[in-house]
């Protein structure tokens, strides 16, 4: 048996078989795994995602257009309402409400008019209405009738009776000839006559603005606005 090659071959095979059996029964040795970070691959969008993105963009554009349209209509409505209110005020405001400026010097206000008492020469022909009109033209004013002038002068006399302060001073007439005639010792006034001139009260700054607006719109022939 010592020199038999067949027996040696069989012993070698048995040794390999035993070694394989031991390796199979032994527990596996732990192995260390090293993580490998790889960038994610870009996947092409699916057809459903493309449709959803297009719909979202369309809705966003529609919302923006709707917002701009709403804001534009709101601004247009505000402008139209303001224009209507301003036009209505310009066309319907009463004239008396715009004549709030104080009367000029040497005059006093009676309602919407500014009244100016004037002295007339009795020797001349200035006591009639035409003569008073000539005097009033110097002030660019109109002459009141004799009855109206008499009532106004009587009113001034009544206001001045029993008052320590001159009515002429209160009415801004203290520097006129009429104020001097209020003194009884001033005999020259007995040869004078009295007349009354009047004019419309001046317009306030708002009245001037509305008057110019009506002139610009050429509405004077439709809605009279005497100065």
Curated annotation (Swiss-Prot):
Subcellular location: Virion membrane
Residues bearing attached sugar chains per UniProt: 121, 128, 146
Maturation and modification: N-glycosylated.
Family indicated by similarity: Belongs to the herpesviridae HHV-1 UL45 family.
Lipid bilayer topology: Single-pass type II membrane protein
Residue numbers on the Intravirion membrane side: 1-65
Transmembrane portions of the chain: 66-86
Gene source species: Equine herpesvirus 1 (strain Kentucky D) (EHV-1)
GO cellular component term, pick one: virion membrane
Virion surface side: 87-227
Keyword Phosphoprotein: no
Record's protein name: Envelope protein UL45 homolog
Keyword Acetylation among UniProt keywords: no
Keyword line: Glycoprotein, Membrane, Signal-anchor, Transmembrane, Transmembrane helix, Viral envelope protein, Virion
């Amino acid at each position: 048996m010592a020199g038999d090659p067949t027996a040696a071959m069989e012993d070698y095979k048995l040794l390999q078989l035993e070694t394989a059996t031991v390796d199979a029964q032994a527990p596996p040795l732990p192995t260390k795994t090293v993580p490998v970070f790889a960038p994610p691959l870009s996947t092409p969008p699916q057809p459903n995602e493309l449709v959803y993105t297009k719909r979202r963009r369309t809705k966003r554009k529609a919302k923006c257009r709707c917002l701009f349209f709403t804001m534009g209509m709101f601004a247009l409505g505000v402008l139209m309402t303001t224009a209507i209110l301003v036009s209505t005020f310009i066309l319907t405001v009463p004239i008396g409400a715009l004549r709030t400026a104080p009367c000029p010097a040497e005059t006093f206000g009676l309602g919407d008019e500014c009244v100016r008492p004037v002295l007339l020469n009795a020797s001349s022909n200035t006591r009639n209405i035409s003569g008073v009109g000539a005097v009033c033209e110097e002030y660019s004013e109109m002459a009141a009738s004799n009855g109206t002038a008499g009532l106004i002068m009587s009113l001034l006399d009544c206001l001045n009776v029993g008052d320590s302060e001159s009515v002429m001073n209160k009415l801004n007439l203290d520097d006129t000839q009429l104020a001097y005639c209020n003194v009884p010792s001033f005999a020259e006034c007995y040869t004078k006559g009295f007349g009354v001139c009047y004019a419309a009260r001046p317009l306030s700054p708002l009245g001037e603005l509305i008057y110019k607006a009506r002139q610009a719109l050429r509405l004077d022939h439709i809605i009279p606005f005497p100065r």
